[in-house]
């Protein structure tokens, strides 16, 4: 599961947005393990997102 193309987009340093929670602002990916992405969002701090249930929009790849 960790090698799925969708999970590979969310590497540490990538910038993302959660379309269902626009007030969270832009977040920076901290880690992605087994489809769970830890993100530090500008307006709400750290959140752990399960990609099986919540969609994320990739804004910018890391590096």
Where are these regions (language model features)?
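Mixed-charge, Lys/Arg-rich low-complexity intrinsically disordered regions
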Residues: 1-15, 23
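Intrinsically disordered, low-complexity, charged/polar segments
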Residues: 1-4, 46-63
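Short beta-strand-centered aromatic/proline hotspots
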Residues: 25-32
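Beta-strand-connecting loop/turn residues
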Residues: 34-35, 54
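SH3/SH3-like beta-barrel fold
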Residues: 37-42
